[in-house]
């Protein structure tokens, strides 16, 4: 549930996300505005996984790659400002994180190509092309007006890839123990 006044103020779900990660973006934006996002553990949610698109769909893969880039572009610099970084530094910091994320996506695309999954390879390339056309970069002045918030709960500040591959950590247990709550 969300307060209708907040829903209207933040313009609800961002329509650019279609079918994947739009609720994550909304919750992230709520936190950037200084609100808490909570859950009720006793609640039950019925969700048909793969109800929109089958798990093996190249379109689903494209949406996942594209929308995760949009999520970072929309919220990462603002998050760094909320944590106390100066706006220009926050933009550079976000750019670095997103650059490395794109490099890792390129590695994924290469693996798909080398393993004969040309449809997945194309999906990753299309995701990046579409993300570029959908992104509206935050400007320094807007970031400067934002101010600090108490932080973003549930954000992991490290690399899950390094934690998993290089340190041999079980990813979700490790992340849960390191998350900023």
Regions found by a protein language model. Name each.
Residues 25, 86-87, 142, 146:
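Residue-level signal for alpha-helical context at structural boundaries
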Residues 1-2, 24, 104, 108-112, ...:
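Catalytic-site signature of metal-activated, phosphate-bearing donor transferases
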Residues 1-44:
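A short, conserved alpha-helix in the catalytic core of glycosyltransferases
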Residues 25, 62, 163-166:
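General helical secondary-structure elements
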Residues 32, 36-140:
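Active-site-adjacent helix/loop segment of glycosyltransferases
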């Amino acid at each position: 549930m969300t307060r209708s006044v907040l829903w209207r103020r933040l313009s609800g779900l961002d329509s650019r996300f279609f079918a994947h990660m739009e609720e994550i973006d909304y919750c992230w934006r709520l936190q950037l505005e200084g609100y808490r996002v909570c859950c009720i553990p006793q609640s039950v949610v019925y969700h048909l996984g793969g109800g929109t698109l089958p798990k093996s769909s190249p379109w689903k893969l494209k949406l996942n790659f594209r929308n995760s880039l949009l999520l970072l572009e929309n919220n990462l610099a603002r998050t760094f400002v909320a944590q106390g970084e100066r706006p220009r530094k926050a933009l550079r910091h976000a750019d670095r994180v997103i650059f490395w994320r794109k490099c890792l996506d390129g590695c994924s695309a290469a693996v798909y190509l080398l393993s004969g999954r040309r449809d997945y390879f194309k999906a990753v390339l299309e995701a990046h092309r579409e993300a570029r056309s959908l992104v509206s970069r935050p400007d320094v002045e807007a970031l400067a007006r934002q101010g600090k918030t108490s932080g973003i709960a549930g954000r992991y500040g490290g690399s899950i890839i390094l934690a998993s591959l290089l340190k041999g950590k079980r990813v979700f247990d490790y992340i849960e123990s390191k998350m900023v709550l």
